[in-house]
């Protein structure tokens, strides 16, 4: 019998070896604690006696739930701390970053007040038993190992600690050979998940399977009535599969049951495993109440799928799916789509979509991608796609691309085949986009260190658009565009001079269908034009240092290209460039390669910047104007009027960073007759406490042959109002049609362990005309609940704001981490 505290170091696997060595190995060195020679008189009944607690486990939980300002919390260096809305956080005895060694490799230190053999030959340790094993710690009042070293029994507030995890049980029975056993009346803490709970009994049925009976789980602060908790008759955790299964599960909010689920399958680690994902609930005015239950299928390490049965009360049953794959050396991709048979809100028509995307980086120089999209109708995405960033394109892209770059210095090339599905059946064939069957693009730039540079561009494509509705004569064929340019870049800190001489050419060959449609005679089916061009870009740089750094850059740009008649040339993909300050110094007034511009103009401009001592550009102002010496006779359409203006009006660009949080910008362009061609104003403010304000106004005058009218106001805000509450809104107002194309207003509450958002949204499909009597706005009211630690039941609001509110991600981060 030993009646003093003993301490030994040895290999610990299994627990029986530790106790047997402690009691029997005389060769192991011992050290004595300060209490050496004092016989333990601990009363186990007193140790088991519970202090009267307001809720089970109160004493245990409050011991490890500390204020964030506490020294032990500060030692975590802001890692693993709970959310900004929690005053306290869990701190377990062993840092979550500490990795425990395998039991058969770790060295252990065992201390106890008292050790002996009982009459049955069992090994017994009593009084403050501590087993410290390089990343693991066991504490108990008493530990007993049977004489066969097979069964271990620990009792008296048995604590097990390991990297970020801690449990306390009344008793533990464990089979050391099969690594199975039971833990009675256990409380547990997970620091990384900010979670805690209780289990009436924990059974380790195998080395990899643990079953919790009559168990609870919550990420709320410890208390008598947590904000929410999960209670289950049985929770089975399988480390081999990485999945957990609950049976007889109920969700409680403030001790009130609000949801019962007989069976639920969930992940317990980062592995992808088959199971049911979080259901999604919603409501809209044209779909009614809806429910989606995604099922994830982990088919193999390199591919998986998600199948989502979905029910919309006013439309019917729908099935959606997604398949993702990763090949060995041939890239990755995904396939997704959905089908809703006999939509009751859409004349009982079948609604469906299908999408395919594949990307393959063949090597450092070559890559390829393939994309295919299909939808049954133009309203599909606004009606049925639950994603807030769903497509609203009129034309769905289908393309294959082969890309080359980073090989030969200065060379980039692309070969692609591209076609489109036009969703709106009312669109005439003449207004549909051309298919490229195929298109080849090449850009090569080279030069020398002295500033001389050569550039070659080629764009060769066969454009095809069939005209089957007699809306126009067919105009399909091959277009070959070439450009060769030589420029000299002279740049110094004080000035720059960049002359450039280029030659551009277009060759067009109509195909047989177009020749037949237009009744072309021999020779007129082929068109060719060559245009030389000269440009000179020059400017000065002035700087003035003082309290603020000021820069002044006057700039002059001249461009000349002779007129070549291009009437009757097809326009495959070109549009008119928008007006801006930078566009004043660009000789190309068309986007695309269907026209070779005639030029003879001079643009003058000046830019001024003011920088403060921390580098903020407190003011940037630019003003410029173009002066034309000849009419611009080349137009996109033969019926377009020739531009005879002698000059543009002033083009102004202003911006200011008033401080690190507040930015304003304004742009405006006038025509020579004084009419305002376009203007926009934008204001951005992001506060340090989660507040945000955006305001924008955008106007475009209707100029035939150049630009369509556009007149809209966009505004958004996020504003904390009190404690954990904030309100948010977004509006896009179409002033041309005097209607709000989208309106969103919501309120959000965040607590330590749960959050709720309620918002209403009304919107029009981007492809619809609000003035049409057959078009009505879509309306939806959504309630979104997030149980932190379980994931959200819905995440649409965050996605909506992320895609519509500039700066949302940054401000949302400051809100949650404040």
Curated annotation (Swiss-Prot):
Disruption phenotype: Non-essential under typical in vitro growth conditions. Loss of lptD causes impaired in vitro growth. Decreases LPS levels and susceptibility to polymyxin B, increases outer membrane permeability and hypersensitivity to hydrophobic antibiotics. Causes an accumulation of lipid IV(A). Deletion impairs cell envelope integrity more than the loss of LPS biosynthesis, presumably due to the accumulation of toxic intermediates. InterPro entries: LipoPS_assembly_LptD, LptD, LptD_C, OstA-like_N. Keywords: Cell outer membrane, Membrane, Signal. It comes from the Bacteria. Transmembrane segments: none annotated. Component of the lipopolysaccharide transport and assembly complex. Interacts with LptE and LptA. Together with LptE, is involved in the assembly of lipopolysaccharide (LPS) at the surface of the outer membrane. This is LPS-assembly protein LptD. It comes from Acinetobacter baumannii (strain ATCC 19606 / DSM 30007 / JCM 6841 / CCUG 19606 / CIP 70.34 / NBRC 109757 / NCIMB 12457 / NCTC 12156 / 81). The gene is lptD.
